[in-house]
Amino acid sequence: MKQISIELITKGEPTTEKVLESISQQTFGDYEVTCVNSSYNPMVAELLKEYGVHEIPVKPHTKHLEARYLAHTNSTGEFRLLLDSTRPLDKNTLETLLYKYSKFRAVCIREKSLGQGFWVKQADILRSLSEHSDFQKNGSKIAYILPRFYREDVLNNAFKFLKQSIDNRLFTEISYGEHHLIYDAAKLEPSDITITDEALISHYEDESSKAIFRKYHWYGKSQRTLNLLKFDSNVNKLNSHKRPFSFSTFVPKMRTIPIRSLRTIAFLIGYFF
């Protein structure tokens, strides 16, 4: 058994190789990588094989929650890192998570934005705003930044609850909000969770208004599926990602009106139409 399992999902995004390369350069070596691959492209499977990844090939339209479940059930590590193929790691990410934060049952990981242009800068400010305003060190709440690094037993219990609470058809249709569902199902106490002091993951942001609109339009459509859930979860509440207002967040909130407006309009169009 490895100490850390990286549970990766990919649809064949161009940044997949960057993520795999970042994993191969880790200063900590006792890990395994399991990747659920829903790409049509056979070159993605070859790439995963080249990097020694345990591939779980699935149908191209496999949704995110099912992909996360398959990655988890095919991994063996004592700790689990939920990763996407748009999020490369810093070279010391695994080492830092294990030796500095492993006493916690779940860890939220600060990120930094990758890319160029106006929309990337907007996303970076918004990310900093989320990390600043929605996580409180005294453990009162986590509303927007969600854990990616879990102890194995926490994820076991979370997926067990989700499989028991969601019928199989709906489980396979959930393509958005899976991180929030997993977090809610884990039923953690505030003292179980922390957020890293460092930015240990990077994120390739959408660089065009068209890409942002397409993504959040899809999120809006996917929200309809979440409304079918029979148990109480923040993920099926439209205000679950609302950032609290305070004096210290006023300026960044004003500066990010363009991206927040674009995301909101796209989401609502997808949700209602």
Predicted regions and their residues:
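Short, well-formed alpha-helical segments that are part of the catalytic scaffolds
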Residues: 12-25
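Glycine-rich, basic loop-to-helix element that forms the pyrophosphate-binding segment
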Residues: 59-75
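Acidic donor-binding loop at a coil-to-helix junction in glycosyltransferase catalytic cores
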Residues: 165-184
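Short, flexible, basic/aromatic active-site loop/helix in glycosyltransferases
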Residues: 109-111, 115-141, 145-147
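Conserved donor NDP-sugar-binding/catalytic core segment of glycosyltransferases
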Residues: 91-120
